From Swiss-Prot:
One of its GO terms (biological process) is regulation of DNA-templated transcription. This is RNA polymerase-associated protein RapA. The keyword Cell membrane does not apply. Transcription regulator that activates transcription by stimulating RNA polymerase (RNAP) recycling in case of stress conditions such as supercoiled DNA or high salt concentrations. Probably acts by releasing the RNAP, when it is trapped or immobilized on tightly supercoiled DNA. Does not activate transcription on linear DNA. Probably not involved in DNA repair. ATP binds at D177, E178, V179, G180, L181, G182, K183, T184. It comes from Escherichia coli O6:H1 (strain CFT073 / ATCC 700928 / UPEC). Residues 490-662 form the Helicase C-terminal domain. The gene is rapA. Its EC number is 3.6.4.-.
């Protein structure tokens, strides 16, 4: 094409220069000025890498003054174009705009504009864009979206709770699984789902100070959620950046003490518009009707302002009824306002639990039982389901399951309370107790005797506590530097045990930090044993370092010496040997100690070693725990109740361990009480809750579905293709691990999630669980999501040209592959992607408008095509521009039908699902007061907004490929 002064051209290789103007032409060269950057370029006339910019009727163009015009006619005179049309701002028609006055900052965003302007992408980028659209759409439609990306084992009961709660609007629930069943992971899964779907954006986690760092690391390592830890220092810093310091971060962790200490700080927390509040160790919030604690009041105030609340707590039996009611009251004060009424309700759950047990047993039901079930469910037309459940047909089992679901929906706190027990969850190790009876040294005997004389006025409780720790009595008289460890037989036994088990990791727990520090020194100096220490005097980072050193396999510490605080919230299930150097004062603390090793996922039986001194409170307590409560070898939900009931007698025996008369009877009575309470707990409400929380076959099927997805080879192929195109180096390290590092030729200079030093990744869940240094890559990992965003939010791969070598077709035959996207714009919290994620519609048109896409599959077709360089491609486009325009118009005429079908299907699905959920909850509202009014209102509002957004759904051309047939 001849060059003329004033013509507008665009550079094929430097499209960022914008629109160029021909300012000089001679026999061999042409000079273009690019006004938007002020740069000149000199090109050879014969084969210059530039493309003539020509607009067509229907296009919208912008003048250098900023006003826009819809083109209706194009005139050419002496090689220069004049566009005639209607101005969009004044609606003036017949306006002429010469091409020299076009806006130089012109950006070609439509695929066809980019193609005609010579902005042609590599063929592999077009293929990647289509795959990104296709896979992205498929992932949004997965029923377990949000549950696959976490680095956790696929444990059915955890997945069941997360799947149920994570999909709710502003969930307000109590997670009260027994110790070791993974409440933190359940909470993380719920957060991950809510954040990924857009249901929540701002999250506040409040935990005891000792657990802050653990939550921070756990959320990042397992769920790729980067929380900010707020303490006094961080809060003061953030005050310089915003009126409300908490507005500076979306995801925040702080301690309960930090939140409670300052009135202004609590007000700032309440005003920060969180979507979700998570409170760990919620059983520490003390409440009574007359005097709730300040901690309880602080959380109560926050819970009034935050729509979604997750409370993590000990089991209801351990708490006692009043304390349990107090947690539920935080979640829904309107529903749980009267403690006496709550107690009465709980008594009425026995018949429901019996009915559920009856259905699950599979026995034939009598007419009376059928009538009772009908009355309990209170639904019309329930008769056929009852008959099916009582028949021998194939549908009997599913009918019984449906009736169980209905019963649980309608009765009790199953919507707000989740509680799994070890009885209902398989996969726990055995616990084996080894008691080591040791003689009481004369030094201790003397100290105890003197202490008894001098402390005669002490209360029985104080004397009992003293008698548990004889080394402290000795130090009271001999001074803090008294070397009790030189004669205490427990120390000698511990050193012998550790030296004979050098290959074993051993957790040693004692009540006081001073004991742990003194033991570390003795072990190091006498036997060269590597021991890490973990106590309340250390900073969080120091504790983390100690825990990490203990976790290291080859060069790590053999022993971790913990004070009592070390047994709250920290998990060391890679170890299976525990030594209790002394015993805690109550059964809850004992269970907490053992719970650090006894967790789901523990591979070995747990060996619990208790060296104790005879004729001390230790010898009394070891018998009471083991023979009276069976608390060492099994979890003991009855412990707190029995402890409270025999407290005074037990204290007297502990204070005077020599006086054992009647102690055998006490143990016998406690054991009988324990067995009776245990039997009682296994009936009634607990059974109902357990069935609901566990999820049964449904939860198992969910875990299996996700496991199948873990083997998705499409992800690996797509990820490697994505990394190649972004410019990320990949180095296979074996053992299913790959090291990714940035290259010098990245699509973007800083890719989110990829550090300068690189990262190690794996696509294998088992490898990710074993290797903390490897990131677990799934469709939900930020690296993949950021990659999808990078490709799909820009124009990468949106226009390309390929050659098809096929002698069955005439040379020069044109095909145009069009990728349309059908989508609806809506706020993220509506979660419209459940029904209509941005969905690609592929068309492959010839010049007559025949759509060959159904006959010619994308990947097969893509392998038959050859790439064209950009310069040759521009020439081809110019030669067939009018034909391509005509095919595009045929495509526009055809897409409407396909797009409308997708939109209608999405509307029907949304209407059906959201209306069904609303109807179900409205029906249940009549019989189950645990359904909140605001939840019903939110679902109805959500349904209306979703339907309105789907009514506004549309489609657009996202990418196109021009294919030219050749025989060479």
């Amino acid at each position: 094409m001849p060059f003329t002064l004033g013509q507008r051209w665009i550079s094929d290789t430097e499209s960022e220069l914008g629109l160029g103007t021909v300012v000089a032409v001679d026999a061999r060269t042409v000079t273009l000025l690019f006004p938007s950057t002020g740069e000149n370029r000199l090109y050879a006339r014969s084969d210059s890498p530039v493309t003539r910019v020509m607009f067509n009727p229907g296009d919208t163009i912008t003048s250098h003054d900023g006003w826009q015009m819809q083109v209706e006619e194009v005139k050419e005179e002496n090689g220069l174009l004049t566009y005639i049309g209607t101005r969009l701002d004044t609606e003036e028609s017949g306006v002429a705009l010469r091409e020299v006055f076009l806006d130089s900052k012109l950006v070609f965003s439509k695929p066809q504009d980019r193609l005609f302007a010579g902005q042609i992408d590599r063929m592999d980028r077009f293929a990647l864009r289509y795959r990104a659209r296709k896979y992205s759409s498929e992932q949004f439609r997965m029923p377990y979206s949000g549950l696959r990306g976490q680095r956790t084992s696929l444990i059915p009961h955890q997945l069941n709770i997360a799947h149920d709660v994570g999909r709710r609007h502003a969930p307000r629930v109590l997670l009260a699984d027994e110790v070791g069943l993974g409440k933190t992971i359940e909470a993380g899964m719920i957060l991950h789902q809510q954040l990924l779907s857009g249901a929540a954006e701002r999250v506040l986690i409040i935990v005891p100070e000792t657990l802050q760092h653990q939550w921070l690391v756990e959320m990042l390592r397992r769920f790729n959620l980067r929380f900010a830890l707020f303490d006094d220092e961080r809060y003061a810093e953030a005050q310089h950046d915003a009126y409300n310091p908490f507005d500076t971060e979306q995801l925040v962790i702080c301690s309960l003490d930090f939140a409670r200490r300052s009135k202004q700080r609590l007000e700032h927390l309440c005003e920060a518009e969180w979507d979700l509040l998570v409170v760990d160790e919620a059983h520490h919030l003390v409440w009574s009707e007359d005097a709730p604690s300040r901690e309880y009041q602080a959380i109560e105030q926050l819970a009034e302002h935050v729509p979604g609340v997750l409370l993590l707590t000990a089991t209801p039996e351990q708490l006692g009824m009043e304390s349990h009611f107090a947690r539920l009251r935080l979640l829904d004060p309107n529903r749980f306002h009267d403690f006496a009424q709550f107690v009465e309700e709980q008594k009425n759950y026995r018949p429901v639990a019996d009915a559920v047990a009856m259905l699950l047993a599979g026995n034939k039901l009598s007419n009376d039982e059928l009538n009772m079930l009908g009355e309990m469910i209170g639904e019309q037309d329930i008769e056929p389901l009852l008959q099916a459940a009582n028949s021998d047909s194939e549908d009997a089992q599913s009918a019984r399951q449906e009736l169980v679901s209905m019963l649980m929906d309608r009765h009790g706190t199953s919507r707000v309370l989740f509680r799994n027990t070890r009885n209902g969850v398989k996969g726990f190790p055995k616990r084996e107790l080894h008691t080591i009876k040791l003689p009481l040294p004369t030094q201790y005997q003397t100290a105890i005797k003197v202490s008894g004389i001098m402390g005669a006025r002490k209360s029985a409780e104080d004397r009992a506590r003293d008698m548990l720790y004889p080394e402290r009595i000795y130090q009271e008289f001999e001074g803090d530097n008294a070397t009790w460890w030189n004669f205490d037989p427990r120390v000698e036994w511990l050193m012998g045990y550790l030296t004979s088990h050098r290959s074993q990791k051993v957790l040693v727990i004692c009540a006081k930090a001073a004991t742990a520090l003194q033991l570390e020194q003795v072990l190091r100096e006498r036997e060269g044993i590597r021991a890490a220490v973990f106590h309340e005097g250390m900073s969080i980072i120091e504790r983390d370092r100690a825990a990490a050193w203990f976790a290291e396999e080859d060069t790590g510490a053999q022993v971790l010496l913990c004070s009592e605080i070390g047994s709250e919230g920290r998990n060391f299930q890679f170890a299976s040997h525990m030594v209790m150097f002394d015993l805690p004062f109550n059964p809850d603390l004992l269970e907490q100690r053992i719970g650090r090793l006894d967790r789901i996922g523990q591979a070995h039986d747990i060996q619990i070693h208790v060296p104790y001194l005879e004729k001390t409170a230790q010898s009394v307590l070891v018998r009471w725990y083991h023979e009276g409560l069976d608390a060492f070898e099994h979890t003991c939900p009855t412990g707190r109740t029995i402890y409270d009931s025999v407290y005074n007698d037990l204290i007297n025996y502990l204070a005077s361990p020599d006086e054992t008369e009647g102690f055998d009877d006490l143990i016998k009575n406690c054991r009988e009480q324990h067995e009776a309470l245990k039997a009682q707990l296994e009936q009634g409400r607990d059974r109902l809750l357990e069935i609901h929380s566990n999820g049964g076959e449904k939860a198992q099927a969910l875990a299996e579905s996700i496991e199948e997805q873990d083997d998705d080879t499409n992800l690996i192929a797509f990820a490697m293709n994505l990394f190649d195109i972004i410019g990320i180096n990949q180095d296979d390290r074996g053992d299913n691990m790959i090291v990714l590092t940035p290259s010098d030729h990245m699509l973007v200079p800083d890719f989110p999630g990829l550090s300068e030093d690189g990262i190690t990744i794996t696509f294998d869940r088992e490898v990710a669980l074993a290797r903390e240094d490897a990131q677990f890559i799934t469709w939900e990992h930020p690296l993949i999501r950021n990659g999808l965003d990078l490709i799909l939010s820009g124009d990468t791969g949106s226009s390309t040209i390929s050659l098809l070598k096929n002698k069955a077709l005439p040379v020069g035959t044109l095909l145009v592959e069009l990728i349309y996207v059908v989508e609806a714009q809506a706020p993220k919290q509506l979660q419209l992607n459940r029904f209509l994620p941005p969905t690609p519609v592929r068309m492959l048109l010839d010049k007559n408008g025949n759509n060959l896409a159904a006959q010619v599959e994308f990947e097969t077709f893509n392998r038959q095509l050859n790439a064209v360089n950009r310069h040759t491609g521009s020439k081809l486009v110019n030669a067939v521009q009018q034909d391509v325009h005509a095919i595009l118009q045929l495509g526009e005429a055809q897409i409407e039908k396909s797009a409308r079908a997708l939109i209608d299907a999405a509307r029907n699905e949304a209407d059906e699902k959201l209306s069904a959920e609303l109807s179900r909850l409205e029906a249940l509202r009549a019989v189950n007061p645990n359904i909140r009014d605001d939840e019903l209102t939110a679902i109805e509002s959500n349904r209306q907004q979703v339907m309105e957004s789907l009514d506004q759904a549309g489609w657009r051309l996202d990418a196109l490929r021009l294919i030219v047939v050749t025989h060479q």
